[in-house]
Swiss-Prot record:
Membrane-topology annotation of the record: Multi-pass membrane protein
Induction of expression: The mdtABC operon is transcriptionally activated by BaeR.
GO cellular component: plasma membrane
Name recorded for this polypeptide: Multidrug resistance protein MdtB
Gene behind this protein: mdtB
InterPro entries, sorted: AcrB_DN_DC_subdom (IPR027463), Acrflvin-R (IPR001036), Multidrug-R_MdtB (IPR022831)
Top-rank taxon, per record: Bacteria
Function, in words: The MdtABC tripartite complex confers resistance against novobiocin and deoxycholate.
Record carries keyword Membrane: yes
Length: 1040
């Protein structure tokens, strides 16, 4: 078990020490590359995470949830279910809309997934309803990358249909052309259309039916090829007046003749310009608006993209009528800028604190300048590598660099301290640099590679969390590697040129006082260490106690997934009684908007009512509440949410569910709350039996709050029970009945108007102003086989029933989603365990399954892999240390320091009231890499003293501890002060950074105190064990 002796001639550092110009120019090159890389790097909130999710939306106005499920969703699901690489498929079928969300494996390229989805849609086309207005439309959805900006377009003079047309054809297209913009979606649903509202009494009096009118309109408005004439000398293209463009033209359309007199559409219907869907609407601060959500392209710089949009807005506004106003409702870059700025400030603060601690220990300005140059050079040089790896400047990479501040200075400190020691003994600076750098080179390599080894398991973390922290781990590893290079090249070269006996011995009042203080501390430590070495078993029992305590703390500490951030945006869902109408829901959202906008923390509000790809039913509304910047409001987002919910509770007939928008969103569907739990069955009847029972139990749990379910089975249905025998005698088919109902009440899209700029629809419906409710069914007329007009009431009875407002599937089976939040005094781990315990008490049938979804599922996965992740980090470090030391024993001595770090980190988190979440776990893994450096520095010098000076193991480890006490204390304090700004952060994004800082500071404090005493004892214990093992082997060999 021999360690290779370090070279006294400078080793790999010799070339750089002897060639200062070349070394300086090399470092300048690294600096310039880093500066250029910094300017080229995009800025974002979190690393780029491509979450391969595709959403397929099919609209079929007028269709019930049951029809949408059986006629649209099911055929598509059967085709999608055959695709390879599909991880999960969920669907939501509501009145007139089917939304299928396809989540693929992370390893499947999104382009391949798109091709498979398109092929599946093509295969299902023949199975879909023939009168489907438009084929299914698919779009890429990245839940981890929400819109960067939300705009509202309003007008005080123009109707919203014209505003929507203007936004779609002019504003949205211009914004889409901006570099970095990926997708612009519109909400508000006010697309222009010609609406034909039939007068049921008028057409009945004339002996007509709605089907007669529909056939006349579709035949009168066509747009198809007509050919051309090709003569001997010229060619003539054929054209005709087959298109009708305006409501006035449709009014004049002759639909029938009676007694030789024409009957025009205007005689039996109100024909007007209106909206394609009158049951959709969006509002911005209570003013009706068209809302635009702008998403960026993958990899685009979110800051520059948002700046480009803002620069274009004045030009766009000038090109619009004066009554049209474009307003920025939310801009994610405001918080991203603030968060990145705060993190950069914390990085600068960490550098300043580290340099300060260096001066405190070295008490010499030239000696302080050297690491003061090495630290920023290592960090800046990292930016150059980040560019080549397609990384970005985000909260996690900046956190990595902030943490790296304490890491990278370690190498420089160890080199400077060792070289200074030889200079103080009287050697020339150049000789001291060569000797000191050569002697310490192996230690630097050990520190570097053992620390990088800890980060390796992070690269193999699965799912989206692994993708997220890959940039963090690699950025930190690159900074550490560059630091090692700088410490073995630039640092010894600068020591040889800048340090001297005179400068090191030059003292002032502060240096003399601090020197005396350090001498007393070292003397006290020496006395304490001597006593500890005399009582090894007591010390060993303390070490074992820390191991036991760390396990107990791990078991009992509250556990979470990801810190809840305050990004200044709140997503909300407003729920009203089932079967609430659009008008009723619009009125309720106005009442709620009045309450919300009175809150002093609220800056703006966007609300949406109606059924579309994200809103499942008319009795729910979506809200986006944009808060004032953090420095302009008194409370953080959770307090604002609590206050708003209390205020809205006073509005009768509505339930409000709010959750803060997060940079990391794993949920693929719009959710009412932060966490979801699903109940899946083979039939809707089974769900109707068990959902109420489970909900009743869950609502009694103190560990969860805001419990709600998307199971709504009390939607009013007017069931038309047709007497088939009577209908058959009259020559009336079920298709005739369905067509008549669809024409009257389905907002049926019956024709298309083509223009040079866009396409618009003709909508057919009955005018129900004078016959509201079920009375409108009495006006339906059908045509019998002999041409007579038959009232629907003569062949059918109307029954009122209840049915689900939406039918949801998970992997093709019925499912309901239960949403919940976690109260402040409980953790997500508590909530998950309570739900699982409750589920067991119900004794659910075998055909009913439960599963957590979204963030909760990711939490379970992360929690299950955390222990293995830490074990992998320890094993990786053991392997690296074993290779470096050519020993099975010494790595164990070094790794014995780890429980102390775990105890400190977990205690600090509990005292601070923080959960053990993913960020805190990353901090603990980093601690594994940091705290072992104390042992490495002790053992390196102890082994060298035993080998070169013939010291006994006890004397060697004792002298090594005293000799390395100062650099150990310096490096630990440097790492601690590097993490301190993260622990104390209070600005935007502080929730993300604070757990990392808390865990690292706590772990470093406890490990620093304990490992200075436990490591020497364990070193001697294993040394005796090695001698005993050798003697046993030797005895066996002699006996053999």
């Amino acid at each position: 078990m021999q360690v290779l002796p370090p070279s006294s001639t400078g080793g790999p550092s010799r070339l750089f020490i002897m060639r200062p110009v070349a070394t300086t120019l090399l470092m300048v090159a690294i600096l310039l590359a880093g500066i250029i890389g910094y300017r080229a790097l995009p800025v974002s909130a979190l690393p780029e995470v491509d979450y391969p999710t595709i959403q397929v939306v099919t609209l079929y106005p007028g269709a019930s949830p049951d029809v949408m499920t059986s006629a649209v969703t099911a055929p598509l699901e059967r085709q999608f279910g055959q695709m390879s690489g599909l991880k999960q498929m969920s669907s939501q079928s509501s009145g007139g809309a089917s939304v299928i969300t396809l989540q693929f494996q992370l390893t499947l390229p999104l382009d391949v997934a798109e091709q498979e989805v398109q092929a599946a849609i093509n295969a299902a086309t023949n199975l879909l309803p023939s009168d489907l207005p438009n084929p299914p439309v698919y779009s890429k959805v990245n839940p981890a990358d929400p819109p960067i900006m939300t705009l509202a377009v309003t007008s005080t003079a123009m109707p919203m249909t014209q505003v929507e047309d203007m936004v779609e054809t002019r504003v949205a297209q211009k914004i889409s052309q901006i570099s970095g913009v990926g997708l612009v979606t519109l909400s508000g649903g006010q697309r222009p259309a010609v609406r034909v509202k039939l007068n049921a009494q008028a057409i009945a009096a004339l002996g007509l039916t709605s089907e007669t009118v529909r056939t006349a309109i579709t035949g009168a408005n066509v747009n198809s090829a007509k050919g051309s004439l090709d003569g001997p000398s010229r060619a003539v293209t054929l054209s005709a007046n087959d298109q009708m463009q305006s409501a006035e033209e449709y009014r004049q359309l002759i639909i029938a003749y009676q007694n030789g007199a024409p009957i025009r559409l205007g005689d039996v219907a109100t024909v007007e310009q209106g909206a394609e869907n009158s049951w959709l609407g969006a509002w911005a601060n209570k003013e009706q608006a068209i809302v635009m959500n702008v998403q960026r392209q993958p990899g685009a710089n979110i800051i520059s993209t948002a700046d480009s949009i803002r620069q274009m807005l004045p030009q766009l506004t000038e090109s619009l009528p004066k009554s049209v106003k474009v307003t920025v409702l939310s801009d994610r870059t405001t918080n991203i800028r603030a968060s990145v700025d705060d993190t950069q400030f914390e990085l600068m603060m960490a550098i300043a604190l580290v340099v300060m601690i260096i001066y405190l220990f070295l008490r010499n300005i030239p000696a302080t300048i050297i690491p003061g140059v090495a630290v920023p050079l290592s960090l800046i040089g990292t930016f150059a590598v980040m560019v080549f790896l397609d990384f970005s400047i985000n909260n996690l990479t900046l956190m990595a660099l902030t943490i790296a501040t304490g890491f990278v200075v370690d190498d420089a400190i160890v080199v400077i301290e060792n070289i200074s020691r030889y200079i103080e003994k009287g050697e020339k600076p150049l000789a001291a640099a060569l000797k000191g750098a050569g002697e310490i080179g192996f230690t630097i390599i050990s520190l570097t590679f053992s620390l990088i080894a800890v980060l390796i398991p992070l690269l193999f973390m699965g799912d989206i969390v692994g993708r997220l922290f890959r940039e963090f781990a690699i950025t930190l590893a690159v900074a550490i590697l560059i630091s090692a290079v700088v410490s073995l090249t630039l640092t010894p070269m600068m020591c040889a040129r800048m340090l001297s006996q005179e400068s090191l011995r030059k003292q002032n009042r502060f240096s003399r006082a601090s020197e005396k203080m350090f001498d007393r501390i070292i003397a006290a430590y020496g006395r304490g260490l001597a006593k500890v070495l005399n009582h090894p078993w007591l010390t060993l029992s303390v070490a074992l106690s820390t191991l036991l305590l760390s396990v107990l703390l791990w078991v009992f500490i509250p556990k979470g997934f990801f810190p809840v951030q305050d990004n200044g945006i709140i997503q909300g869902t407003l729920q009203a009684p089932q079967s609430s109408s659009f008008a009723n829901m619009a009125q309720r959202q106005r009442q709620v908007a009045d309450v919300i906008l009175q809150d002093p923390a609220v800056q703006s509000l966007t609300s949406f009512v109606g059924v579309d790809g994200t809103n499942p039913s008319l009795n729910s509304a979506r809200l986006q509440i944009n808060l004032k910047p953090l420095d302009e409001r008194d409370d953080r987002v959770q307090k604002v949410i609590a206050r708003l919910q209390t205020a809205v509770d006073k509005v009768p007939g509505v339930d409000l569910f709010l959750q803060p928008t997060q940079d990391l969103t794993i949920d693929t569907q719009v959710s009412r709350t932060q966490y979801q739990f699903t109940l899946q069955a083979t039939s809707l009847d089974a769900l109707s039996t068990w959902v109420p029972q489970l909900m009743e139990k869950l609502q009694q749990l103190p560990q969860i709050s805001d419990v709600s379910s998307d199971w709504q089975d009390k939607g009013l249905v007017a069931y038309v029970n047709v007497d088939r025998d009577s209908a058959s005698r009259l020559g009336i088919s079920m298709a005739d009945v369905d067509n008549a109902l669809y024409n009257a009440f389905g907002q049926r899209l019956i024709s298309t108007i083509y223009t040079q700029a866009n396409q618009y629809r003709v909508v057919l419906e009955h005018n129900t102003e004078n016959t509201p409710g079920l009375a409108a069914l009495d006006t339906i007329r059908l045509t019998s086989s002999d041409g007579g007009v038959v009232p629907l009431s003569s062949i059918a009875k109307i029954e009122q029933r209840f049915a689900p407002l939406s039918i949801n599937h998970l992997d093709q089976f019925p499912v309901t989603t239960i949403s919940f939040n976690v109260p402040d005094n409980y953790s997500l781990g508590d909530a998950v365990q309570a739900i699982m315990d409750t589920e067991k008490t119900l004794n659910l049938p075998v055909d009913i399954t439960t599963q957590f979804q979204g963030s909760t599922l990711a939490f379970q996965s992360a929690l299950g892999s955390t222990v293995w992740l830490i074990v992998a980090a320890v094993v990786a470090m053991y392997i690296v240390l074993g290779i470096l030391y050519e020993s099975f024993i010494h790595p164990i001595t070094i790794l014995s320091t780890l429980p102390t770090a775990g105890v400190g980190a977990l205690l600090a988190l509990m005292i601070a009231g923080s959960e053990l979440d993913v960020i805190a776990i990353i901090g603990i893994i980093l601690l594994i890499g940091i705290v072992k450096k104390n042992a490495i520095m002790m053992i390196d010098f102890a082994l060298a003293a035993e080998r070169e000076q013939g010291m006994s193991p006890r004397d060697a480890i004792y002298q090594a501890c005293l000799l390395r006490f100062r650099p150990i204390l310096m490096t630990t304090l440097a790492a601690l002060l590097g993490a301190l700004p993260l622990m104390l952060s209070t600005g935007v994004g502080a929730e993300l950074r604070r757990p990392l800082g808390i865990g690292m500071v706590g772990g470093l404090i406890v490990s620093q105190v304990l490992t200075l005493f436990t490591t020497p004892v364990i070193y001697l214990l294993f040394d005796r064990l090695a001698l005993w093992t050798k003697s046993r082997f030797a005895r066996h060999e002699e006996e053999a």
